């Protein structure tokens, strides 16, 4: 199997879908001519291969970028637009939250908006809270959207291809730290269905539920737990909206314990939703209270050493798990 | 009814006072006192040297990514027009203006060295912190201006932003509010010809950025942004107008980003060396120095002495900074300042980390 980073996997997905369907085009700030002449970045080389009409560098205008996606998608194009960093989605949010998410409903199902908004997220590169702010729970609070947050290169590729083919607006969130970590990606054509979680490690003692960059942390934590005699199951949600309740509940009913791990801040974070579902539908299976391991309720600190304390790590996870064993 | 023209006064001027050889257009001389001229020169030199030093520190891994200002030092001419009670609202390329207004170099190093202290605004200095979301700070400057009017104080808010920022809706909403409410806001657009890898020509179809003022019926002017005298003169006109109740102005400083967008990129990948060389001929410091030498305000010895002096100042600031950070950071500090009073839920999270850290120590 080929070894690709998530950046390369996203790049392959974009390439393949652009070749497959002329309606697919890309727009965003620096998606064509980039300052990063780095083959590991998701849109590297696409301008050269597909030309400036299909790979559009835009002015600095997030609302217009998202609006371009809304308007062009109703005409049947399949835009894949990029918001450079997650916090800047606030500027594009009218288009995404009030329009992309709602116009199908308002049109009585007549109009479809097959668009993808890709955005880079994640702390860990010392750029402070106005660059790093994981807002997936905001997005997941918007009916009409699909919210995808892959944790491995292979998932990113298969899910992005599905997102591009999906007739609904999909918010596709990529953690930048994953751009540079290689992983196996199948050579042959494949897609991964949106709305399907994946059990990344089978275990019997506790369900660790996570997504995006934290899946890697969960797997590391599971390794340490194994050395301590705890057999953890790692459930990678991959899609937050629509949520795969079945995989979640099956796992928790089996293990009887739940720890949710995400990088975003705790209060109002998506872990709350997971815990609520489990409390509603699997409370009787729980042998111990569930736990959340998350970033604290503060903006991401600028300082790299402080940032390391901010981002949950495998030790935080192990401690939380051991606390309910 | 036949079509008829609507009478609009549309005018956009370009003002340059010192040409590339340092020759002064006497008719336009803003008559800046000699000591202020020398202070402006020193501030530009300090900014250049500090910028160079930060690049070295970044390459050594001592500070993180930052946005170099090389070539845009003449902005201090605008900051120099402000009174202490006025407000400076920077983006991320206004280090020279921030220093002029009293921010310390240590504090800049704190910011890019990754310490929250960098955003701290010392008592009595009316600067807002660096703003990362492009163009957003233009709106703050309207709010500041609104408050000034509300309180009846005669202050002014000057907001800096780039050519790229004029593509954001925020900029247009800010301009409209400022014009409708007639706030004492000066919009200072540093057109450095690039927004990361997008050239000015592909950022806006408008011939000038200054002309965007016309749509909001406020004065707009283009200044030679590499000529500190023009920057000073144009900014003074706008600040005086704002202070006397005449409302906002849009100023476009035509300048050039001689260095990289941030230390994370290599501009050679997307722009020609020739373009950079053309702009190097218009270096704002070289030009101003020629002028000052011509007027005998600077001599060879004087320049050398000042450069030495400036380098020392940079070195001393760096030493103070190193000493400060040598004391280390307390992870618990990251919980401070998020709220005026720490909410109980956050206190609990802080205590959780405190426990964890003390357990680790044991
Ligand atoms: C809202 C927002 N979108 C995108 C970015 C990423 N970004 C940082 S600087 C920049 C270009 C800004 O260009 P300009 O306004 O000309 O300022 P300059 O960097 O040239 O000083 C962009 C797109 C950002 N910081 N904020
Ligand atoms: Mg610019």
Annotate each language-model stretch with its function.
Chain B
Residues 1-75, 259, 268, 273-362:
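Conserved acidic/glycine
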Residues 14, 85, 248:
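A residue-level signal for beta-strand positions that form part of recognition/binding surfaces
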Residues 19, 90, 222-224:
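Structural signal for conserved beta-strand scaffold positions within catalytic alpha/beta enzyme cores
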Residues 21, 92-94, 189-192:
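Short, histidine-centered active-site or binding-site loop motifs used for metal coordination
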Residues 49-52, 56-183, 199-205, 210, ...:
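Cofactor-binding active-site loop characterized by glycine-rich and histidine/acidic residues
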Residues 92-93, 253-255, 326-328:
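Short, well-ordered beta-to-alpha junction loops that form the rim of enzyme active sites
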Residues 135-323:
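Glycine-rich ThDP/TPP pyrophosphate-binding loop and its adjacent helix/strand module
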């Amino acid at each position: 199997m080929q070894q690709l980073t998530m950046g390369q996997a996203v790049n392959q997905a974009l390439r393949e879908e652009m070749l497959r369907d002329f309606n697919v085009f890309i727009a965003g700030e620096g998606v064509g001519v980039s300052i990063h002449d780095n083959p590991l970045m998701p849109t590297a080389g696409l301008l050269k291969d597909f030309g400036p009409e299909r790979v559009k560098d835009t002015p600095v205008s997030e609302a217009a970028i998202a609006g371009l996606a809304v308007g062009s998608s109703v005409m049947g194009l399949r835009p894949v637009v990029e918001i450079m960093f997650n916090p800047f989605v606030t500027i594009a949010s009218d288009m995404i939250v009030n329009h992309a998410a709602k116009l199908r409903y308002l049109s009585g199902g007549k109009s479809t908006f097959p668009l993808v908004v890709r955005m880079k997220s994640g702390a860990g590169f010392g750029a402070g809270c106005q660059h790093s702010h994981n807002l997936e729970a905001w997005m997941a609070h918007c009916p009409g959207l699909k919210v995808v947050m892959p944790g491995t290169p292979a998932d990113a590729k298969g899910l992005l291809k599905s997102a591009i083919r999906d007739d609904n607006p999909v918010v596709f969130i990529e953690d930048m730290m994953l751009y540079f970590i290689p992983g196996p990606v199948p050579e042959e054509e494949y897609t991964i269905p949106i709305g399907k979680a994946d059990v990344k490690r089978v275990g019997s003692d506790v369900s660790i539920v996570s997504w995006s960059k934290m899946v890697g942390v969960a797997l590391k934590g599971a390794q340490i737990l194994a050395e301590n005699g705890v057999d953890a199951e790692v459930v990678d949600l991959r899609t937050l909206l629509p949520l795969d309740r079945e995989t979640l509940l099956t796992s928790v009913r089996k293990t009887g314990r739940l720890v949710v791990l995400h990088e975003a801040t705790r209060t109002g974070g998506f872990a709350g939703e997971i815990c609520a579902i489990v409390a509603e539908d699997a409370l009787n299976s729980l042998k111990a209270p569930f736990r959340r391991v998350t970033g604290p309720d503060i903006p991401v600190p600028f300082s790299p050493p402080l940032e390391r304390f901010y981002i949950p790590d495998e030790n935080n996870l192990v401690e939380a798990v051991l606390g309910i064993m | 009814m036949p079509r008829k023209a609507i009478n609009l006064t549309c005018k956009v001027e370009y003002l340059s006072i010192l040409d590339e050889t340092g020759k002064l257009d006497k008719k336009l001389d803003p008559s800046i006192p000699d000591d202020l001229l020398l202070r402006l020169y020193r501030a530009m030199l300090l900014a250049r040297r500090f910028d160079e030093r930060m690049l070295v520190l970044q390459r050594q891994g001592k500070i993180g990514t930052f946005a170099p200002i090389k070539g845009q030092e003449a902005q201090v001419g605008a900051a120099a027009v402000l009174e202490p009670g006025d407000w400076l609202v920077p983006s991320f390329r206004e280090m020279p203006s921030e220093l002029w207004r009293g921010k310390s170099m240590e504090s800049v190093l704190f910011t890019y060295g990754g310490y929250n202290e960098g955003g701290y605004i010392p008592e009595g200095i009316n600067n807002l912190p660096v703003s990362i979301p492009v163009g957003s700070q233009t709106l703050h400057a309207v709010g500041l201006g609104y408050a000034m009017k509300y309180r009846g104080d005669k202050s002014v808010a000057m907001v800096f932003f780039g050519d790229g920022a004029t593509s954001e809706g925020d900029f247009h909403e800010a301009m409209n509010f400022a014009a409708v409410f007639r706030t004492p806001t000066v919009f200072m657009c540093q057109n450095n010809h690039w927004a990361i890898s997008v050239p000015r020509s592909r950022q806006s179809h408008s011939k000038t950025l200054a002309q965007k003022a016309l749509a909001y019926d406020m004065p707009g002017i283009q200044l030679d942004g590499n000529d500190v005298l023009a920057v000073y003169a144009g900014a003074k006109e706008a600040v005086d107008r704002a202070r006397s109740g005449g409302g906002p102005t849009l100023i476009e400083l035509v300048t050039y980003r001689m260095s990289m967008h941030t230390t994370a990129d290599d501009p050679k990948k997307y722009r020609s060396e020739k373009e950079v060389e053309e702009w190097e001929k218009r270096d704002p410091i070289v030009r101003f120095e020629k002028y000052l030498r011509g007027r005998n305000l600077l001599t060879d010895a004087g320049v050398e002495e000042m450069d030495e002096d400036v380098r020392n100042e940079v070195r001393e600031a760096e030493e103070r900074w190193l000493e400060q950070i040598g004391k280390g950071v307390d992870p618990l500090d990251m919980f401070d300042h998020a709220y005026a009073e720490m909410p109980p839920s956050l206190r609990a999270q802080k205590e959780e980390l405190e426990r964890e850290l003390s357990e680790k120590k044991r």
